[in-house]
């Protein structure tokens, strides 16, 4: 548990929103509308054919997709792609497979890919849960990122949260031994739930020690985005949870 002397402020969220038509059918997104800018539309046309992947429902061959053998990191819900592009730029030796359904967000990341000349990102504009179920082979991932998923603040909506035991079991099974799962949230009750769910998964081991209550220091590769800085100014805490596959 995290000690707090003041009420937890409402959280903002950037990536990995979640929706559900039934508690047993959790998706990795909530349907949102938004305008695609001229620059984003141009990025779809100019670089989309190279960096957008079609959902096939068939197991992926990462070597064929990226044209090389390299560690592959899954990202679920990247918002407008600010952190994604930053991390991919820091780690050109790694492949990044990024799932997001929000069209302006996909367009924004494509624009960043073009502007920063990134070559190690591929995007699937599809529900990440279905991608995990049908396209990611067991033991194929070197890591997974879920940054600021929709916290679904109301107790009656908690069942809609993305990070629950069934999804984590699927993700853990798709990590290689030594692969990691990194989650971050600015909503204290969700941080507690994430820690509880990951701690209960037998394939995963916490990288943090007891002195930190199970929460990890922010890894250096994860940037403070405009979204996160805005939250900090509003008094939000941010909790990182990092587990590895045993």
Swiss-Prot record:
Any one of the GO CC terms: tRNA methyltransferase complex
Broadest EC class assigned to this enzyme: transferase
EC assignment: 2.1.1.33
Protein name as annotated: tRNA (guanine-N(7)-)-methyltransferase
Region of interest: Disordered: 1-23
Role this protein plays: Catalyzes the formation of N(7)-methylguanine at position 46 (m7G46) in tRNA.
Region ranges (Interaction with RNA): 156-161
Active-site residues, record numbering mapped to chain: 150
Residue sites binding substrate per the record: 154, 186, 225-228
Reaction equation(s) it catalyzes: guanosine(46) in tRNA + S-adenosyl-L-methionine = N(7)-methylguanosine(46) in tRNA + S-adenosyl-L-homocysteine
GO molecular function: tRNA (guanine(46)-N7)-methyltransferase activity
Pathway(s) of this molecule: tRNA modification; N(7)-methylguanine-tRNA biosynthesis
């Amino acid at each position: 548990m995290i000690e707090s002397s003041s009420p937890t402020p409402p959280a903002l969220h950037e990536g990995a929103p979640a929706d559900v038509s039934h508690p047993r059918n959790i998706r990795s997104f909530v349907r949102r509308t938004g305008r695609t800018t001229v620059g984003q539309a141009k990025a779809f046309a100019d670089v989309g054919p190279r960096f957008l992947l079609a959902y096939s429902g068939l197991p992926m061959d990462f070597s064929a997709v990226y044209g090389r053998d390299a560690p592959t990191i899954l990202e679920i819900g990247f918002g407008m792609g600010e952190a994604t592009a930053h991390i991919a730029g820091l780690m050109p030796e790694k492949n990044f497979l990024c799932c997001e359904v929000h069209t302006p967000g996909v367009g924004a990341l494509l624009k960043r890919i073009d502007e920063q000349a990134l070559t190690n990102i591929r995007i699937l504009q599809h529900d990440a849960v279905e991608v995990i179920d049908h396209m990611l082979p067991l033991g194929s991932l070197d890591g997974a990122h879920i940054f600021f998923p929709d916290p679904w603040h109301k107790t009656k909506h908690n069942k809609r949260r993305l990070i629950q035991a069934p999804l984590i079991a699927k993700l853990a099974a798709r990590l290689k031994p030594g692969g990691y799962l990194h989650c971050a949230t600015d909503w204290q009750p969700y941080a507690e739930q994430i820690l509880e769910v990951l701690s209960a998964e037998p394939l995963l081991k916490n990288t943090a020690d007891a002195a930190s209550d199970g929460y990890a220091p922010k890894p250096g590769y994860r940037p403070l985005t405009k979204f996160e800085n805005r939250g900090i100014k509003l008094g939000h805490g941010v909790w990182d949870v990092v587990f590895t596959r045993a």
